[in-house]
């Protein structure tokens, strides 16, 4: 696709857009000045870019009908394996549909990408296949991942296996629902505000948001570079540890992972937690929307840790209450600029840029923007409003405040091995009807991140484990650890899991 020299009319229009007053002679001179840089673009078109590596042979699979998609959790079903032997031999894994699998359609929950088929595997997919895992399919997710509930996916509502009238959570709702329904033992999710932990909590499964920079997101569609995470969801703590072992570590592309420090996650499963100290985060229990019954289930689970030799005491981190405000300043403008205006791949980062995804996203933005969910429209318009009127000031300030938020948690974690709180202050909400008012559809998609989103900003690992039922719906306990200390969280999670059937707590 050669880059054409703009006409003098186009250059005049470009200048006017920036408030430039250009004479006819200046416009003509700028047209000539364009020729040198555009010659470089011409050469770029000729050069052959590297790819992510060879792709194993496979069938593209199929889109399942209602009979084999009871909860709407599948977008596409496959049976991809290489015959390799490793830590995931015999395991079936669902892949969140914001992660590329070569030859398999990908929507990322959005009409914008309908019909797109990537030609490459994301790093995490390659690692799963090399470890002997079988890719069972793509798990449905929320529209461009801009929802913490499960009613904005373009392929249909994703339902909670514990009560199909209730949300599975989001944005990795399909991943958690498939694990909860027993269709796969493990799945991959993404997390920018709680999108691994929310559905894991609401569906009663185990979900880990790793330390920022531990797991490469190469080949995954981003939202905002500074809060993007990819991590495991499993039916057990062992499933989470097993999958994390395979996907963690630098991949040569994602520069966020250069400093990644991996641990022996499988060995951590057998290490008793006796002697560890945990801080019970006061602010995590005190939101206006906190359900006392949820708080009680979480405190009972914490008591079971005491029986395993873990010391606990209450701790206060006042910054936790301002964390969601810092997160909002980062994610809203960041997503609008990087994802929506960056055509699904963003810019100014060191990493792999999937050109085919970028082109597909640009086509969708040009032809199907009115088909996106209300949450996507909100992010697009609000981000642009802040950009035009406040010139990125609040995004920049939020990025600076990130340091203070991180330090506040780190100060508490100097004394404690982990911080504990409810994952979500309440159980899964009812799925709004298709004709729900716009405000209801948006509010129920975005009202649950009070405890989760701050740790996307601070980058600390956060592990949710099921710890009880309230009116038949699961409750999650979230444990937050030091950077790259996922092993301690696995030790604590194993102790809670071993304490007995969480459904009877």
What are these regions (language model features)?
Residues 121-122, 126-251, 456-469, 473-476:
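Short glycine/serine-rich loop segments
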């Amino acid at each position: 696709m050669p880059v054409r020299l703009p006409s003098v009319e186009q250059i005049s229009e470009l200048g006017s857009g920036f408030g430039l007053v250009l004479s006819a002679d200046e416009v003509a001179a700028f047209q000539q000045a364009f020729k040198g840089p555009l010659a470089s673009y011409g050469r770029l078109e000729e050069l052959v870019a590297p790819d992510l590596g060879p792709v194993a042979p496979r069938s593209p699979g199929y889109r399942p009908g209602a009979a084999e998609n009871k909860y709407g959790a599948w977008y596409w079903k496959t049976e991809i394996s290489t015959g390799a032997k490793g830590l995931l031999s015999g395991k079936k894994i669902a892949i969140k549909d914001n992660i590329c699998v070569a030859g398999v359609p990908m929507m990322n929950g959005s009409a914008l990408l309908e019909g797109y088929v990537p030609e490459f595997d994301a790093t995490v997919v390659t690692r799963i296949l090399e470890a002997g895992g079988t890719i069972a399919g793509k798990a449905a997710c929320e529209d461009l991942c801009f929802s913490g509930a499960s009613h904005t996916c373009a392929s249909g509502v994703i339902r909670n296996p514990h009560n199909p009238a209730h949300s599975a959570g989001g944005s990795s709702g399909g991943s958690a629902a498939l694990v909860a329904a027993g269709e796969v033992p493990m799945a991959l999710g993404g997390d920018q505000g709680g999108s691994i932990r929310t559905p894991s909590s609401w569906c009663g499964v185990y979900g880990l948001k790793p330390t920022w920079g531990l797991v490469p997101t190469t080949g995954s569609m981003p939202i905002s570079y500074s809060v993007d995470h990819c991590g495991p969801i499993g039916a057990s703590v062992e499933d989470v540890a097993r999958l994390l072992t395979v996907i963690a570590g630098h991949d040569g592309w994602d520069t966020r992972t250069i400093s990644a420090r991996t641990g022996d996650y499988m060995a951590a499963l057998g290490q008793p937690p006796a002697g560890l100290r945990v801080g019970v985060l006061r602010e995590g229990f005190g939101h206006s929307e906190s359900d006392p019954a949820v708080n009680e289930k979480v405190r009972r689970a914490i008591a079971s840790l005491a029986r395993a030799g873990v010391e606990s005491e209450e701790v206060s981190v006042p910054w936790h209450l301002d964390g969601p405000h810092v997160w909002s300043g980062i994610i809203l403008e960041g997503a609008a600029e990087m994802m929506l205006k960056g055509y699904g791949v963003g810019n100014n980062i060191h990493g792999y840029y999937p050109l085919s995804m970028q082109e597909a996203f640009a086509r969708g933005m040009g032809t199907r923007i009115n088909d996106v969910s209300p949450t996507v429209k909100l992010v697009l318009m609000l981000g642009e409003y802040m950009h035009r009127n406040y010139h990125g000031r609040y995004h920049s300030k939020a990025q600076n405040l990130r340091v203070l938020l991180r330090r506040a948690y780190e100060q508490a974690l100097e004394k404690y091995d982990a911080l504990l709180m409810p994952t979500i202050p309440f159980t899964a909400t009812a799925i709004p009807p298709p004709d729900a008012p716009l405000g209801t559809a948006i509010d129920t998609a975005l009202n649950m991140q009070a405890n989760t989103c701050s740790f996307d900003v601070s980058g600390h690992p956060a592990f949710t484990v099921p710890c009880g039922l309230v009116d038949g719906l699961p409750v999650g306990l979230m444990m937050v650890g030091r950077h790259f200390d996922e092993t301690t969280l696995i030790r604590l999670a194993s102790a809670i899991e071993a304490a007995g059937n969480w459904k009877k707590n």
